[in-house]
């Protein structure tokens, strides 16, 4: 559901975590569209702080945004 209703997905691979970040990255790479017919932008960051900044920036522009990290 989360992949389907977002435009920007910021991920930071960390252990342990849910497999959702990997799935979102794979779906976006395959060109799987969300409910609006666009492919969400998936960005992999280098830290959890980077994810927080990316999410904040995306939300400030009005994008529907989520993150998958610890």
Curated annotation (Swiss-Prot):
Q: Does the keyword Glycosyltransferase apply?
A: no
Q: Keywords on this record?
A: 4Fe-4S, Electron transport, Iron, Iron-sulfur, Metal-binding, Nitrogen fixation, Oxidoreductase, Repeat, Transport
EC number(s) on file: 1.2.7.-
Pfam families reported in the protein's UniProt record: POR_N
Q: Which GO molecular function annotations are given, in alphabetical order?
A: 4 iron, 4 sulfur cluster binding; metal ion binding; pyruvate-flavodoxin oxidoreductase activity
Query: Which is a GO BP term held by this UniProt record?
Result: response to oxidative stress
Q: Which residues form the signal peptide?
A: none
Catalytic activity field: oxidized [flavodoxin] + pyruvate + CoA + 2 H(+) = reduced [flavodoxin] + acetyl-CoA + CO2
Report the domain of life of the source organism. Answer: Bacteria
Q: InterPro entries, alphabetically?
A: Pyruvate:ferred/Flavod_OxRd, Pyrv_Fd/Flavodoxin_OxRdtase_N, THDP-binding
Q: What does this protein do?
A: Oxidoreductase required for the transfer of electrons from pyruvate to flavodoxin, which reduces nitrogenase.
Q: What is this protein called?
A: Pyruvate-flavodoxin oxidoreductase
What species is this protein from? Anabaena variabilis
Lineage summary: Bacteria, Bacillati, Cyanobacteriota, Cyanophyceae, Nostocales
Annotated gene: nifJ
